[in-house]
Amino acid sequence: MKTKKLGNSDIETSEIGLGCMTMTGIYGPADENESIATIHAAIDNGVSFIDTADAYGGGSNEILVGKAIADRRDKVVLATKFGNIYAKDSERGADGRPEYVREACEASLKR
């Protein structure tokens, strides 16, 4: 698997990443064991860039990814996103306030 430096940092990651959005039922039912096996297979085959977001399943995707990489954390560059807000009435919005950024990052780290 080809790798490259992430921006100007010393972090090196695979050129191919694994997006995990659909692993928590965004487009229909998802099997947790199958999703974890998929993440493990990707890592075993050299994929080190794993992508998730707090909006995927209301944080459940981050929990799933965390469970999958728990014993492989040193092999993974983990990316998450935040800022998408979903209200109870299905209204969408965005929040980029500094206090929300901190809150979202802390919540993602806990998951």
Walk through the language-model features, giving the residues of each:
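N-terminal binding-site loop/beta-alpha segment at the start of enzyme catalytic domains
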Residues: 1-77
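A short acidic, helix-capping loop that chelates divalent metal ions and anchors anionic groups
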Residues: 22-27, 85-91
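Conserved catalytic core of Hanks-type protein kinase domains
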Residues: 42, 81, 111
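Generic beta-strand or strand-like secondary-structure segments
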Residues: 64-68, 81, 100-107
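A short, structured active-site edge motif that brings together acidic residues
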Residues: 75-87
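Glycine/proline-rich, positively charged
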Residues: 88-111
